Swiss-Prot record:
Main location (coarse class): cytoplasm
GO biological process annotation, one example: defense response to fungus
Protein name: Inositol-3-phosphate synthase isozyme 2
Keywords, alphabetical: Cytoplasm, Inositol biosynthesis, Isomerase, Lipid biosynthesis, Lipid metabolism, NAD, Phospholipid biosynthesis, Phospholipid metabolism
UniProt xrefs under Pfam families: Inos-1-P_synth, NAD_binding_5
Similarity field: Belongs to the myo-inositol 1-phosphate synthase family.
GO molecular function: inositol-3-phosphate synthase activity
Tissue expression profile of the protein: Expressed in siliques, leaves, roots, seed endosperm, but not in embryos. Highest expression in seeds. In leaves, only expressed in hydathodes and vascular tissue.
Gene Ontology cellular-component terms listed: cytoplasm
InterPro entries: Myo-inos-1-P_Synthase (IPR002587), Myo-inos-1-P_Synthase_GAPDH (IPR013021), NAD(P)-bd_dom_sf (IPR036291)
Pathway: Polyol metabolism; myo-inositol biosynthesis; myo-inositol from D-glucose 6-phosphate: step 1/2
Organismal lineage: Eukaryota, Viridiplantae, Streptophyta, Embryophyta, Tracheophyta
Name of the gene encoding the protein in the UniProt record: IPS2
Intracellular or extracellular location(s): Cytoplasm
Amino acid sequence: MFIESFKVESPNVKYTENEINSVYDYETTEVVHENRNGTYQWVVKPKTVKYDFKTDTRVPKLGVMLVGWGGNNGSTLTAGVIANKEGISWATKDKVQQANYFGSLTQASSIRVGSYNGEEIYAPFKSLLPMVNPEDVVFGGWDISDMNLADAMARARVLDIDLQKQLRPYMENMIPLPGIYDPDFIAANQGSRANSVIKGTKKEQVDHIIKDMREFKEKNKVDKLVVLWTANTERYSNVIVGLNDTTENLLASVEKDESEISPSTLYAIACVLEGIPFINGSPQNTFVPGLIELAISKNCLIGGDDFKSGQTKMKSVLVDFLVGAGIKPTSIVSYNHLGNNDGMNLSAPQTFRSKEISKSNVVDDMVASNGILFEPGEHPDHVVVIKYVPYVADSKRAMDEYTSEIFMGGRNTIVLHNTCEDSLLAAPIILDLVLLAELSTRIQFKAEGEGKFHSFHPVATILSYLTKAPLVPPGTPVVNALSKQRAMLENILRACVGLAPENNMIMEYK
């Protein structure tokens, strides 16, 4: 059975006019290596930590500024939200299609809340806590091309032409602000698009972005702003002692107009200085050590890296299944070809390397979890190939071969062919990222013994379900297995309303 909404009734939960307060027992385990009668033993000790959660239920008017607004992802997301808001339908060769948010965790997925008369009860994911309605979001952003969003939508060749015709009046007056352009960080083939750029030194560019954000907030009367990078993949920045290794050195390098500070890092600096959440949707190392240090010192949310939409999402499920089933993956070969602007930019070796790193690390934690299958330091052979084929446009092809060792020296091979409509998969992920980033800024908590409430760590691991290479605080384990990432996100939000984590034991039926 599916219900649209619910309210938790518990002595541990209190609803007020502007808040939900919950007291939550977090049950975990501590592992110690102890000397017992002269012999060291591993001992696992269950423990319970009491947490207080406080969620502000006042939903703000949200502004979202996209870096690369005129790209395939930005134009597709904007078009999709408008189509939903206006209730637009359009004819395809198969049927009359209604606008929807399929592919969005927050808007189109469900959670289990319990059982009723022997039937499982589910509710929308977004019913857990008050979230911003996508149709109330004010979109804007920057681009190195001055093309309006209607023409950008047509150039992208993602949406059906009947839908594009209906959306054009809503989008033709949407024009991105000029963006920061540095040809050293992206492929040379992007130069033909760069007709709307912010001039000046890097310090002047940061100041320009800050001015743009302040004016956007004032013009649109938004309460909060989230900025997300959905522009070209950049090459990796060199992390150099004295250049970008500390906050002091990074800001000094901006002042000195050092060439190795990337455009994405400049946008992120501007956001952190303004206390505005910044999310990196591409694979480059935007968050150099000095920037992470700055975000932590300012308690400003940062998240990334790289949208997890197609091939990598499948990989984070399949390898988790194989290792969890006691099957040993020994070779993973991933081949992609695509024909959109992302593919053209990735045809340059230096930008492809950023994507290769992002895609290749996704199985590390799953391999490390099973010392029966893998010796220390052992790892499957893992190769990623990306080629540019203009004809296929946004319809990316992903082909994977997984070779594994099975019982008694046997071999198992799984081959997948995945046609990923690149921007149609990425757009709802962008939506989820900005909505969850905003929501997380309204949640505070404290553990038993802590005096004051505080927010989540500025490095937002809560967003890791949506990213290929999750950014985590220093010293924090990286989790890539998709099921674990979703469980973490859902269970944290459940804790905010006093619900137990979904453990799937269902003891009432045993």
